[in-house]
A protein has these predicted regions:
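A short acidic, Gly/Pro-enriched loop at the edge of an enzyme's catalytic core
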Residues: 99-110
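Conserved Class I S-adenosyl-L-methionine
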Residues: 187-250
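Class I SAM-dependent methyltransferase SAM/SAH-binding core
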Residues: 46-48, 52-100
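A short SAM/SAH-binding and catalytic strip from SAM-dependent methyltransferases
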Residues: 109-122
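A short glycine-rich, Lys/Arg-flanked "PGG" loop and its adjoining helix->strand segment in the class I
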Residues: 124-136
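Short alpha-helix
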Residues: 170-184
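Conserved class I S-adenosyl-L-methionine
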Residues: 1-40, 54-58, 74-78, 82, 141-163, ...
Length: 250
């Protein structure tokens, strides 16, 4: 199975769980997205890797149109249903990959993405597409899990992420994001950094992680160096904290 198909399969079967996930449905970053879009009258917004639609739902009341874009058709069906339930008539869905955006040049005032890019097969190509479909003077806000600055910490969190979700590619560090945006012709900065508390049981259940992999994650945490356990604040039940960041670019 190719990676794009793997992502679509993994998240198509878990769409309902992501809609009700408190980790995804809440957060101060959603308010930041909404306030940012509200500053641009009649904005047309692209939400890349929209997941169950929480970022789209947050910005839709402040936008002229929101295109919720995802590789998994079942995710998009979930977004359609939830948008209808919320009375958000200016959201439309579109299926596709981040690396091949099916839109005309200079189409969007804002391009946003929340907790998606760590699954993208080719981030440089995706950012080139973002540059192409963004209007002159348009803006970008990306939110994602961040890789750790120290190699010891980074190796462990990438391993944990991959064990939990075989479609995971990489949680990029802040400096990597700046370099990626710079290479795509953007001027980017880290707008915010924070930590997310991960409740282990619901985290693996949401992704339907097979039990042998759950056991492997627990073993990795329990056998990791003290520095790793302390940094990620690993609890006895396997719960821990992840780094997150918001990148602003234009």
């Amino acid at each position: 199975m190719k990676h794009h198909d793997q992502v679509a399969d993994a998240f198509g079967s878990t769409a309902a769980a992501y809609l009700t996930s408190q980790t995804h449905a809440t957060g101060a970053d959603l308010q930041t997205l909404a306030e940012s879009i509200a500053a641009t009258p009649d904005a047309k917004v692209l939400d890349m890797g929209c997941g169950a639609g929480h970022a789209s739902f947050a910005v839709a009341p402040h936008a002229k149109e929101v295109v919720a874009y995802n590789i998994a058709p079942q995710m998009l069906a979930t977004v359609d249903g939830a948008a209808k339930d919320r009375g958000l008539t200016n959201i439309r869905t579109q299926q596709g990959a981040a690396e091949t955006l099916p839109f005309e040049d200079d189409s969007f005032d804002w391009i946003i993405s929340r907790m998606s890019a760590h699954h993208w097969h080719d981030v440089p190509l995706a950012l080139a597409e973002v540059r192409r479909v963004l209007k002159p003077g348009g803006k970008v806000l990306f939110i994602d899990i961040a890789g750790a600055d120290h190699p010891l910490l980074d190796t462990h969190i990438q391993a944990v992420e991959l064990l939990r979700d075989g479609s995971h590619i990489r949680d990029y560090r802040a400096d990597e994001w700046i370099a990626l945006f710079d290479a795509a012709g953007f001027k980017a900065s880290i707008r915010e950094r924070w930590r997310i508390e991960i409740e282990f049981s619901s985290w693996v259940a949401r992704m339907r992680t097979p039990e042998p992999r759950v056991v492997a994650i627990r073993s990795l945490w329990s056998n990791s160096p003290d520095e790793v356990r302390q940094y990620f604040d690993v609890k006895e039940d396997g719960s821990f904290k992840l780094d997150a960041l918001m990148i602003a670019a234009q």
